[in-house]
Amino acid sequence: MKKVCHLTSVHQRDDIRIFHKECKSLQHIYEISLVVADGRGDDVVDGIIIYDVGKPSARWERMILTTKRVYKKALMLDADIYHFHDPELIPIGLKLLKKNKKVIYDVHEDVPKQLLSKPYLNKFILKIISNAFKKYENKSAKKFTAIITVVPEITNRLKQFNDKTVEIRNYPKLNEFAKINVQWKDRENAMVYIGSISEIRGIYEMMQVAYKANIKLHLAGNFSTPALESDLQNHKEWQQVIYHGVISRDNVVELLSKVKIGLLLLHPVPNHLIGLNTKIFEYLAAGLPIIASDMLHYKEIIEVNNCGFCINPFDIDAIV
């Protein structure tokens, strides 16, 4: 049986796309291993072997030392195919190609556009970095065995450099939601947001909506920084938040089955203008109407199918 090794220096071991969709889908025909850097130790989960190279204490450590640890572990495992999920692992992927390995690059985000939204550098420098990375990614794309993308914009760009570029969208597994049997009218009059928690993903606006409407906001996921978590908890609006932490897939489904509204108030930064957030499909699968940002690709799904509203995410009064 051929061996496939997934590599990530950023994502958690129970990442939905990586572990639950890709690793589990492949394990029936391949021997699957997953290399992570989340600090939770080695493990075997559902027959998938997980190797942990240790959680970095800072971004610089992750970019420099963790990537080296991932590469060292990858070499030790001697897989037939390597499938990596983070742009910072591109150099690792290129090194593995030189070892005559097949290497797949899984592009979860439009990184050049994502870089334009980073808060810790000025716009001029960000534009230079974004353009430089785009050239580097395009050049590297030519060399990989295959590329997997999530949205047409990324697919169209990278397919110019590698014709083995395939788009696999991040849709939910509907069988996870089949057990929901709570009628909408019987659910708690509350809202929910599940996912990465950050300023550009609208956390402050969601809290303001909950506070002004005087209804609870159920929140689950990772905070982008400890400083953000601390700041949020010091706001008066936090009293309307019920924070569940990082929760399992079963608990995600359970939480979505208890509330009445799904929120997705993303800020209109470049990466959000093309990316299609998986949460809207999970909300719909759970029978939730959605309040989302007024971006065209969300309007085409939500408003056309009459399953919610798309509103300016900064207009709190209109949302309420």
What do the predicted segments below correspond to?
Residues 5-7, 148, 184-218:
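Conserved donor-binding/catalytic core segment of Leloir-type glycosyltransferases
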Residues 218-221, 229-254:
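Nucleotide-activated donor-binding/catalytic signature segment of Leloir-type glycosyltransferases, i.e.
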Residues 1-40, 46, 146-148, 152, ...:
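N-terminal subdomain of nucleotide-sugar transferases
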Residues 261-264, 282-292:
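Short hydrophobic beta-strand element within catalytic cores of glycosyltransferases
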Residues 22-24, 68-75, 95, 105, ...:
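Membrane-proximal helix-turn-helix segments that form the acceptor-binding/catalytic region
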Residues 51-52, 127-179, 186:
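Donor nucleotide-sugar binding/catalytic pocket of nucleotide-sugar-dependent glycosyltransferases
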Residues 304-305, 309-316:
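Conserved acidic donor-binding segment of nucleotide-sugar-dependent glycosyltransferases
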Residues 73-90, 101-104:
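Short N-terminal targeting/anchoring amphipathic segment
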